[in-house]
Amino acid sequence: MEQKVILFQGDSITDADRNRTNDLSMGCGYPTLVTGHLGAAFPYQYKFYNRGIGGHRVVDLYARIKADMINLKPDYMSILIGINDVWHEIGGHNGVDAEKFEMVYGWMIEELLRELPDLKLMLLEPFVLPGSATRSNDENPGRWEYFRSETDLRRTVVKRLAEKYDLVFVPLQERFSAANADAPEDGYWLSDGVHPTAAGHELIKQAWLEGFSKL
């Protein structure tokens, strides 16, 4: 039986501390949860790759398009990118503004679809919550508003690109916001407002599988 290839692509949320020297390593996040679910439900039908790399912005992801995407010849692929394009600006003035984010993301999608015309691609929405990495503080009283508003811009871009290229869009912000509405303190779903806990990765897995069912 020829296995279909599923590729998870993104930043640290996808990377989730995977062993980058071991192709079988899915990390400690939603790719492992999805792999376990699909692997048990459909034995031997899929081969899985996780190529998320912590800290990456959309420009870093695009730079890896050949080695970590096209050369793997995926049948199905998900992309979750965007939070570092925001975070790197507030942390080191090295972010990617929303206009350039959309331009580069669009180039990447077009190249993927051109080189892999049968690829089934879904775009996951970036998300953020108040947390230790995102809340305002004395040094940066506008920190949370910046994170929220800039992430919102990139969420809008990802949805617009999914519509433009007729791709599956996987919403995540509302799922996290709703889950967090009654949280007694920060950190239950996203440990620092950006990185998911085990429970947060389960939310992504659920949304991922819903999106996958539409491919």
Region locations from a protein language model:
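Serine-esterase "nucleophile elbow" of acetyl-processing enzymes
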Residues: 1-54, 64-73
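Alpha-helical cap/lid subdomain in secreted, periplasmic
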Residues: 2, 33-44, 60-215
